[in-house]
Amino acid sequence: MHSCWNMKLQNEKTLGHSVSRSSNISKAGSPTSVSAPSRFPRTSVTPSSQDICRICHCEGDDESPLITPCHCTGSLHFVHQACLQQWIKSSDTRCCELCKFEFIMETKLKPLRKWEKLQMTASERRKIMCSVTFHVIAITCVVWSLYVLIDRTAEEIRMGQNNGILEWPFWTKLVVVAIGFTGGLLFMYVQCKVYVQLWKRLKAYNRVIYVQNCPETCKKKIFEKSVIIEPNLESKEALGIHHSDTNSSYYTEPEDCGAAILQV
């Protein structure tokens, strides 16, 4: 009987454990019973308020700090020195494209041996090479033609001096020489303007540019810093006064006690 009673108790215990285990599993499996642990607080995702460069959208550091070169505000207020230098070199402009403020900068040319090639596409390089080749050939032909015409004209002048008469072919050649010379000068002037612009671009690309901060933005920064520092100083003074009051009260209490003891 005793053994049967023990067997019955063991069966009841096993049934109770299985029931409780199944209930725990069902609770764990149900989505409504899951609750977030209290030790892991929920964090809200907020946009970063860090200052970033308006060209590369990166933050500033000790090696490449952010500067404020113009009057733009908001997300366009800051820019890296290197990013702005590269933009000025490629665009060949000296003012902001938005607020039109002319940058305050110091320029210095690199040594000639350290000059870099102008960044151009393959089609632009091909056009420049073809243009230079055509211009060299055209200038050679014009110079040779003028030389031949001038030489023959000089011979006719000598013959005319001997005969005392200058024929029509001489005047025709003289007009052709004058027109050719004038056209050659105009052609050289137009092409020289193109090459001068190209030379300016190359010089601008090989300049070392240091852009300074806008004076007004610097004043604003100094004013903001002073406004932030002044309340801190006032709070420190208030804390110092409060601390001195507590210390004085702390030291005056024993004096009162001593006086009371003397009276006794």
UniProtKB/Swiss-Prot annotation:
Membrane topology of the entry: Multi-pass membrane protein
Location(s), subcellular: Cytoplasmic vesicle membrane; Lysosome membrane; Early endosome membrane
InterPro entries for the chain: Znf_RING, Znf_RING-CH, Znf_RING/FYVE/PHD
Catalytic activity: S-ubiquitinyl-[E2 ubiquitin-conjugating enzyme]-L-cysteine + [acceptor protein]-L-lysine = [E2 ubiquitin-conjugating enzyme]-L-cysteine + N(6)-ubiquitinyl-[acceptor protein]-L-lysine
Binding annotation for Zn(2+) 1: C53, C56, H80, C83
Location of region: Disordered: 15-47
Keyword Cytoplasm attached: no
One Pfam assignment: RINGv
GO biological process, one term: protein polyubiquitination
Protein name: E3 ubiquitin-protein ligase MARCHF8
Organism: Xenopus laevis (African clawed frog)
